[in-house]
Amino acid sequence: MIRFHNVSFSYEKEEKVLHSVNLEIQAGLTLLIGPNGCGKSTLLKLASGVEIPDEGRIAVDGLDLWKEEVPARKSLAYLPEHPDLTPYASIREILDFVCRLRERPVEEGKKALGFFDLGHLSHRTVRELSMGQRRRAVFAACLVGKPEHFLLDEPLEAMDRHIQKEILAWIGGNTRSGAAVVIVSHWIEPFVDMASAAVTVHNGSTFCFESLPPDYEKKLAFLEQLAEGEYPLR
């Protein structure tokens, strides 16, 4: 479980993006929905520890994300929309580093690269990769160590069709096995069938709907109702 307790956040010299957020993210697939710029990606950055809240506390399975940083973050994996990678490092070097960081054998990194069809490109540096290949490399790093919480910002963006299918199957398998998967996406239709909860983000506040209709069409219609026509979901 990821828990936000009275969390507020603002970027430097800007108004608050999030105001006194109280939120619990349980096992299963949770969709974050809301208009552009409402704070969805910021929520993921806070939950991953990339950003520090101005006020409040974030806990992962009861562990404070900052006071108990190492054990709390071991169970987290974060896929940013725009990966910031060292341009002259190779994919293999990046995955080897992640394996050392998570105290896992390097073979686990090789397996993750294979899953994303990157094994033959492992010698290439980041600057030689397309944006889609860079995102696949970061996604591969997310698999190392078998985390229990996945924070995915636009997980299908810039991915080939066959990779998208693999990602959707992987997400489905992880949610069924008890992982918590949180997704931000402009295209949520592929995830609707797997979703067990939704969080709306509007004007810096959040509201969680923990019980969604089981039927696909009813679930999609419910989510569209939450969106109030302000942004497309299909």
Predicted feature descriptions by range:
Residues 56-67, 72:
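Conserved ABC transporter NBD signature motif
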Residues 125-129:
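Conserved ABC ATPase signature
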Residues 150-154:
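Catalytic Walker B motif of ABC-type/P-loop ATPase nucleotide-binding domains
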Residues 96, 106-121:
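Conserved ABC ATPase "signature" region
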Residues 139:
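Hydrophobic anchor residue at the start of the ABC signature
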Residues 184-186:
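H-loop/switch region of ABC-family ATPase nucleotide-binding domains
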Residues 48:
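Helix-to-loop junction immediately C-terminal to a conserved catalytic motif
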